[in-house]
Amino acid sequence: MDLIGFGYAALVTFGSILGYKRRGGVLSLIAGLFVGFLAGYGAYRVSNDKRDVKLSLFTAFFLATIMGVRFKRSKKIMPAGLVAGLSLLMILRLVLLLL
């Protein structure tokens, strides 16, 4: 079972809900829930086959790119820098699973 992947998905999902409660951005909530769902489904697929990392890798790369740009623009660690950093760690972990 890919507990790290499921934890990453839960963090993304929880973060989108928390962001919605603080700022009220409906589109941000929908996008965050969708990306969290993709990360969770990717973790489920990795749980069944350790080499099936395509969806998880795509999701982490997408989130690292989007949040990395936001972090570069805002220079704020929370939430953009944290999510970008965690996404980069997920990418590294998933690549190592392929080796």
UniProtKB/Swiss-Prot annotation:
Main location (coarse class): mitochondrion
Transmembrane segment boundaries: 1-21, 24-44, 79-99
Membrane topology annotation: Multi-pass membrane protein
Keyword terms, alphabetized: Endoplasmic reticulum, Membrane, Mitochondrion, Transmembrane, Transmembrane helix
Transferase found in the keyword field: no
Domain of life: Eukaryota
A GO cellular component entry from the record: mitochondrial membrane
A Pfam family annotated for this UniProt entry: Tmemb_14
Subcellular location: Mitochondrion membrane; Endoplasmic reticulum membrane
GO biological process: negative regulation of apoptotic process; negative regulation of mitochondrial outer membrane permeabilization involved in apoptotic signaling pathway; regulation of heme biosynthetic process
Family: Belongs to the TMEM14 family.
Described function: Inhibits apoptosis via negative regulation of the mitochondrial outer membrane permeabilization involved in apoptotic signaling pathway.
Protein name: Transmembrane protein 14A
Organism, as annotated: Bos taurus
